[in-house]
């Protein structure tokens, strides 16, 4: 019986146990255990693809998920990491079929070929099983399934656990896979709860007089998920799932929904929540804070993060008339993936952000009289731009029309527009403008051809996963032009000068993982000039996007920092904005990502410094005692005999390997025997930038929220020279001077 080890997942999982998660039952004599997922990493030889399965087994229920039960022990495969949107595969090493049956526990989505476990022999699927759920409601209960494999005895086989679905029940749960000569007996399923997500509460309805900008209500980090709907008159205004506390003692934080346009009217609010919780709902001009806003213990201080709830992908990024507009995938009413509203913030400099009313709302369904911001279903990712030439004909006054392109999961690729500088948004009545199997459109104006371009993830038999290119003259009618194979989710495409020469430009294309290709684009077709993809970004980085219509020609990128921030009224955050450039290197033209210069305005004066400092066996370190947690550290090291140079900041570290020429896991070549890197340290996270932007890593801190204490540079295995070390303390972007 082979129980093999597992790969580390940095704190993205909620560690919850239950009566069903009792110690694993020992396999019956003669059984062959293939995997029980009890270790800290996936079993040896199991291959992970995509993002849905993370890097290690789940420990029960994940953030934003209904209660998971029926698995054995403490671990299981659970692809709800980040919600139903992420996809991926988990493939076992090859094994020999030696018993009559393969038995396993399975639950989650019931989409054939999409959320399933397959048995492959000679590369072909011979048996498959799915979870039981395809419709809203359902249960996250795992039950036994048996495959009769007697006719395959002696053959080599592979197991493949698949999550290739992104809508409702777009995930799969699997546990305790064994070979046996006996079939496992199904367990009685738990009684269905009266509310979604194990919520036993009835629906409660009440009327609330709208006297302020918001309806505010309490949330619990381990609450009972229930549906809330808000009508004003006959109009559907909000319809979302909320993590309600079971009682007053379980309140962790308060959130809000925008209601300013209805002041003076009465809203009918229906919620599946405890009566004592429903009584706390109120209209208010103020959001209730149980911790100081933007100064919570783990709040990033110079990285954008939303006031309340979960965030994932950056969306809609554009500039108009002196303001940067930043949007994002947002769950206003919980710390896990759900609901997919679009948050919205504005900034004059991409550093100091002010949150605005949320721009888009999900789950309008087929209700004709719904709020103008509401989509049919989820508002998945997309982009933004400014219709400077009024090609769509929506402009009403002197202000240009701002346009959002996004995926409405109940409709297709859709548009919303604003004629008042982003204050209000209208869902285009002609949606969808593109109907296909993909999502996450990037909207771009192609000036040489005087037409719009949408680059969007697609998937078909001919091209597999790809970026599809569409064009339009008026934003409303679109033609498909070409496909770029080998990309998944959140497409981005833009033009950059090489070595800052405006007469020598190339185009860059990438998708959610930020691995990019360089080539040529004629407005309809992208042609790469090399095989494969290149890489700048590493670590907990995903789904980045660049600002459209920039005022100074820069291409500035922001990514989703996939960092779990525990026990806060918000979860996840974003990277610092980075300026993208193309440079000629000894390996060819490569893209660099450098933090924008505007961040340097947050540096406090009088940095701690060291120059031309020799580190030897007798004096192997230079060390500074520091206060606070916010730092910008810039290092230049000169090679000596040391194997490594290590920068430590609190419990975290960045290591340069002189022999391997790597900065942590990132390849980074020295120049003239020297290497330069920079670390931006914030309360829950840090970013490591090597070689002036040749590589860029995003990571959570090991000691989130704790004072750094000391910053040190150490030579390991010999000597080196600290050519320069500068440690700047940083100011908070939330605190106005």
Regions found by a protein language model. Name each.
Residues 74-103, 112-113, 142-146, 198-209, ...:
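Short beta-strands within extracellular/lumenal beta-sheet-rich domains
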Residues 104-105, 159-161, 217, 269-270, ...:
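Hydrophobic core segments of beta-strands in well-ordered, beta-rich domains
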Residues 202-218, 224-234, 261-273, 290, ...:
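Beta-rich accessory regions
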Residues 165-181, 275-282, 719-721:
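Extracellular carbohydrate recognition
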Residues 127-139, 188, 195-197, 236-254, ...:
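Surface loop/turn signatures of beta-propeller and other carbohydrate-active proteins
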Residues 85-87, 95-103, 154-157, 208-216, ...:
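Extended extracellular/luminal ectodomain segments enriched in beta-structured repeat modules
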Residues 27-56, 183-193, 295, 597, ...:
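Extracellular carbohydrate-recognition regions
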């Amino acid at each position: 019986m082979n129980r093999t080890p597992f790969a580390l997942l940095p704190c993205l999982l909620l560690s919850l146990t239950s009566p069903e998660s009792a110690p694993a039952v020992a396999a019956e004599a003669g059984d062959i255990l293939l995997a029980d997922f009890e270790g800290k990493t996936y079993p040896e030889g199991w291959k992970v693809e995509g993002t849905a399965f993370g890097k290690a087994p789940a420990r029960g229920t994940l953030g934003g998920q209904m209660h998971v039960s029926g698995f054995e022990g403490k671990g299981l495969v659970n692809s709800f990491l980040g919600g139903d949107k992420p996809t991926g595969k988990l493939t076992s090493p090859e094994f020999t079929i030696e018993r009559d049956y393969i038995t396993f526990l399975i639950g989650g989505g019931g989409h054939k070929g999409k959320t399933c476990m397959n048995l492959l022999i000679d590369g072909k699927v011979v048996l498959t099983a799915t979870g039981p759920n395809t419709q809203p409601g359902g249960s996250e209960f795992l039950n036994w399934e048996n495959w009769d494999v007697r006719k395959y005895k002696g053959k080599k086989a592979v197991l493949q656990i698949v999550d290739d679905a992104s809508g409702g029940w777009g995930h799969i749960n699997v546990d305790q896979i064994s070979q046996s000569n006996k079939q496992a007996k199904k367990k009685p399923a738990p009684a269905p709860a009266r509310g979604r997500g194990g919520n036993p509460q009835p629906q409660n309805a009440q009327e609330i007089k709208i006297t302020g900008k918001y309806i505010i209500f309490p949330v619990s980090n381990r609450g009972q998920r229930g549906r809330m709907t808000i009508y004003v008159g006959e109009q559907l205004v909000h319809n979302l799932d909320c993590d309600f506390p079971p009682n007053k003692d379980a309140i962790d934080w308060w959130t809000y929904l925008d209601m300013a346009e209805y002041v003076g009217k009465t809203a009918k609010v229906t919620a599946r929540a405890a009566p004592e919780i429903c009584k706390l709902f109120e209209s208010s001009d103020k959001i209730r804070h149980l911790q100081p806003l933007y100064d919570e213990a783990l709040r990033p201080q110079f990285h954008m993060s939303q006031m309340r709830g979960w965030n994932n992908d950056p969306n809609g990024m554009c500039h108009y008339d002196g303001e940067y507009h930043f949007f994002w995938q947002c769950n206003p009413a919980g710390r896990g993936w759900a609901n997919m509203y679009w948050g919205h913030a504005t900034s004059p400099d991409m550093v100091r952000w002010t949150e605005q009313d949320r721009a888009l709302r999900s789950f309008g369904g087929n209700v004709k009289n719904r709020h103008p911001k509401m989509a049919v279903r989820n508002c998945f990712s997309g982009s933004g731009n400014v219709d400077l030439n009024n090609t769509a004909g929506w402009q009403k006054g002197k202000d240009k029309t701002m346009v959002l392109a996004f995926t409405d999961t109940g409709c297709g690729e859709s548009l919303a527009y604003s004629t008042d500088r982003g204050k209000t948004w209208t869902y285009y009545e002609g949606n969808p403008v593109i109907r296909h199997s993909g999502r996450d459109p990037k909207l771009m104006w192609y000036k040489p051809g005087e037409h719009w371009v949408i680059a969007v993830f697609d998937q078909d038999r001919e091209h597999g996963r790809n970026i599809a290119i569409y064009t339009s003259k008026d934003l409303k009618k679109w033609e498909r032009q070409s496909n770029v194979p080998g990309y998944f989710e959140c497409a981005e495409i833009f033009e950059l000068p090489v070595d800052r020469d405006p007469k020598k430009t190339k185009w860059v294309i990438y998708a959610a993982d930020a691995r990019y290709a360089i080539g040529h684009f004629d407005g309809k077709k992208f042609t790469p000039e090399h095989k494969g993809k290149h890489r700048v970004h590493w670590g907990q980085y995903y789904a980045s996007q660049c600002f459209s219509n920039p005022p100074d020609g820069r291409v500035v990128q922001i990514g989703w920092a996939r960092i779990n921030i525990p026990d806060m009224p918000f979860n996840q955050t974003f990277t610092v904005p980075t300026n993208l450039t193309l440079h000629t290197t000894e390996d060819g033209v490569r893209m660099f990502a450098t933090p924008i210069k505007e961040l340097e305005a947050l540096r406090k004066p009088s940095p701690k410094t060291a120059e031309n400092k020799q580190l030897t066996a007798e004096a192997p370190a230079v060390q500074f005692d520091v206060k606070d947690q916010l730092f910008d550290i810039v290092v230049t090291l000169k090679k000596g005999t040391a194997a490594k140079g290590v920068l430590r900041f609190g419990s975290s570290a960045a290591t340069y390997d002189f022999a391997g020429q790597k900065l942590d896991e990132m390849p980074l070549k020295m120049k003239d025997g020297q290497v330069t890197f920079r670390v931006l340290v914030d309360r829950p996270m840090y970013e490591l930038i090597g070689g002036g932007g040749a590589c860029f890593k995003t990571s959570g801190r090991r000691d989130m929220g704790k004072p750094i204490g000391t910053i040190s540079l150490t030579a390991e295995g010999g000597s080196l020279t600290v050519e320069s070390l500068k440690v700047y303390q940083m100011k908070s972007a939330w605190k106005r001077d």
